[in-house]
Amino acid sequence: AVGYTVSEEYIGEALKENPHSFYLATKSMARTYEAMKKDILGSLDRLKRSYIDLYQIHNLGEADYELVFSENGALRALKEAKEQGLIKEIGITSHSVSVLDKAIDTDEFATVQFPFNIVENQGEQVFRKAKAKGMGTIVMKPLAGGALKDARLALRYLTKLDFLDVLIPGMADEKEIKVNQSAVEDDSPLSEKELADIKYLKENMGDKFCRRCGYCMPCTVGINIPMQFLLEGYLKRYDLETWAVDRYKSSDKNASDCI
């Protein structure tokens, strides 16, 4: 994504010898025609490619929906880029079911992307609607933002759902790549133990997680709200108490400053 620091540069460098050997997707938070046009050209340059397979409108919310679809909106730039052969398909990502539901009805997009995992299934009807229209479905947050520690179980669960096409878990090292690859290549039915573990997670973890979408920002007193939840996760899920507490205390504003 354009906003993910140097990710496009790194991928471009890694694939420069054979840039079209992978199906590549990226995305932009641009909402206007000129801003999106600039981002598309920038992505092509950073990725060292003559075209991008899938270019997505990144995290579209209700506030910007009308602008994106307007004459001066980002969608126009994407459609022009597709006509010019600079991108092959146009997609949309969001943390809002209602936004994706409306976007699907426009028939402007090849793919939709939404959070979905063992404990968060609010997007099922959106994904089913998209599949019924021949669209591709992409799952973000398949591990619930790190809350699901058993990556193999989390991914195997998702591969058994016929309305999901692509899973995009984050991977930090080669070991995680191998675990994820093994999970999605295992086409055996879920075992009784796996089903029991899934049932336990559904019943005990709840379905409310911070996805760091930024909808809660800005805070009126300057608290970085997503960071508060991120540090909580490091404390409770990864047992990094000293690190998490130190980071929390060093913040300019934290939860104790909430009015």
Place the predicted regions along the sequence by residue.
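Hydrophobic/aromatic residues located in beta-strands of well-ordered beta-sheets
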Residues: 22-24, 90, 137, 167
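Structured C-terminal cap/extension of enzyme domains
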Residues: 124-259
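Short beta->alpha linker loops
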Residues: 2, 6, 28-31, 94-98, ...
